[in-house]
Amino acid sequence: MCESSNKTENDIVRLSQAMDVLAKLIISKQKDGSQLQVEYEHKLKELEKFINLLLGLHESTVGSMMNTSVLDMVLRNGIEIMEKDDQKYALIPIKAKEEADKTTSTIQGVTSKKSSKKKKNKIKCSFCHEAGHTRAHCGARLTVIPKK
C-alpha cells in the first residue's frame, strides 16, 4: 500500500514538473510573439519615414500631403490587410482567368515548337482504316446512322 502511494506521489510530482515546463515554454513563446509584433511595428514606422523622405513629404509641410490611401494601394499591389479577432491577415488576390490564360498561352507557344518535332501517331482506325486516330474518335463511325 505504501509503495503504491509513493508511486502516485512521484507521478504527481513529475506531472507537476512537466506542467511547469510547459507553462514556461508557453510564456516564452508569447513574449517572442509580442517582441516580433513590436519589431514589426518599429520597422513599419521606419519604412513609413523612408517613404515620406523619398517623396519629399516632411511632417513640417502639411500643405503638400498626398493621399496615403492611393500610395497604400500602389505599394500593396492588390494585397488587402484585414483584422479579425485581434489578428491581422493579408488577403492575396488570385490571378484572373484571363491573366492565367495569357501566361499559359505564352508557355504553350514555347512548347509548341518542341511538340511539332514529335512523331505523328501512325495508329490505324479499325473502322475506316485511316491513320492518325482510333475507332473511338473516328469521324466516319460517329456520323454513320446505325441500322435498325
Swiss-Prot record:
GO terms for molecular function: nucleic acid binding; zinc ion binding. SUPFAM superfamilies: Retrovirus zinc finger-like domains. It comes from the Eukaryota. This is Uncharacterized protein YEL137C. The lineage of its organism: Eukaryota, Fungi, Dikarya, Ascomycota, Saccharomycotina.
